[in-house]
Amino acid sequence: MTKVLFVKANNRPAEQAVSVKLYEAFLASYKEAHPNDTVVELDLYKEELPYVGVDMINGTFKAGKGFDLTEEEAKAVAVADKYLNQFLEADKVVFGFPLWNLTIPAVLHTYIDYLNRAGKTFKYTPEGPVGLIGDKKIALLNARGGVYSEGPAAGAEMAVKYVATMMGFFGATNMETIVIEGHNQFPDKAEEIITAGLEEAAKVANKF
């Protein structure tokens, strides 16, 4: 049975957040089209994820080398392992997130930090790092009020670019990206822009 992990990185209500509307539209369409799949929803804001710090960094390094961990290190590594293993076990992963202050919410950055583990999501080789999750399907669902796909702000976009870069670093080769943008920049076209994006999400979810 196919396992699908939906990762939500916005705790604003749908009526206030287009990225949440996008996430919910994709989720509903996916469930309808794939009734036999196992769908797990991970709301990062409900998880209260601790930032990566000295215990997690030292603990993951020592664990990878087979060294003994302190009690604090073991606790920190157990937190990261919980989310890392869940990610690795999923056949498909869907990320729903906004662009905030040109980048992603801190909680999503922390989550991706947990996934960034040598020997698990990538490995070191003499030629450089090699990703290890190549057969995992990834979908990135993002909303941003301005236009960042082109024009003067394109170089400043660090949300989709960051998540896509990290998934690529982990070896993902099968990625879908859906972006709704410009609804705040062009308020007279907002309804049209959002509706078109939600329709695209439903179509992509059916085939994802």
UniProtKB/Swiss-Prot annotation:
<dbReference type="GO" id="GO:0016655">
    <property type="term" value="F:oxidoreductase activity, acting on NAD(P)H, quinone or similar compound as acceptor"/>
</dbReference>
<dbReference type="GO" id="GO:0010181">
    <property type="term" value="F:FMN binding"/>
</dbReference>
<dbReference type="InterPro" id="IPR029039">
    <property type="entry name" value="Flavoprotein-like_sf"/>
</dbReference>
<comment type="subunit">
    <text>Homodimer.</text>
</comment>
<keyword id="KW-0285">Flavoprotein</keyword>
<dbReference type="Pfam" id="PF02525">
    <property type="entry name" value="Flavodoxin_2"/>
</dbReference>
<dbReference type="GO" id="GO:0016652">
    <property type="term" value="F:oxidoreductase activity, acting on NAD(P)H as acceptor"/>
</dbReference>
<protein>
    <recommendedName>
        <fullName>FMN-dependent NADH:quinone oxidoreductase 4</fullName>
        <ecNumber>1.6.5.-</ecNumber>
        <ecNumber>1.7.1.17</ecNumber>
    </recommendedName>
</protein>
<dbReference type="InterPro" id="IPR050104">
    <property type="entry name" value="FMN-dep_NADH:Q_OxRdtase_AzoR1"/>
</dbReference>
<comment type="function">
    <text>Quinone reductase that provides resistance to thiol-specific stress caused by electrophilic quinones.</text>
</comment>
<keyword id="KW-0288">FMN</keyword>
<keyword id="KW-0560">Oxidoreductase</keyword>
<comment type="function">
    <text>Also exhibits azoreductase activity. Catalyzes the reductive cleavage of the azo bond in aromatic azo compounds to the corresponding amines.</text>
</comment>
<dbReference type="InterPro" id="IPR003680">
    <property type="entry name" value="Flavodoxin_fold"/>
</dbReference>
<keyword id="KW-0520">NAD</keyword>
<dbReference type="InterPro" id="IPR023048">
    <property type="entry name" value="NADH:quinone_OxRdtase_FMN_depd"/>
</dbReference>
<comment type="similarity">
    <text>Belongs to the azoreductase type 1 family.</text>
</comment>
<dbReference type="GO" id="GO:0009055">
    <property type="term" value="F:electron transfer activity"/>
</dbReference>
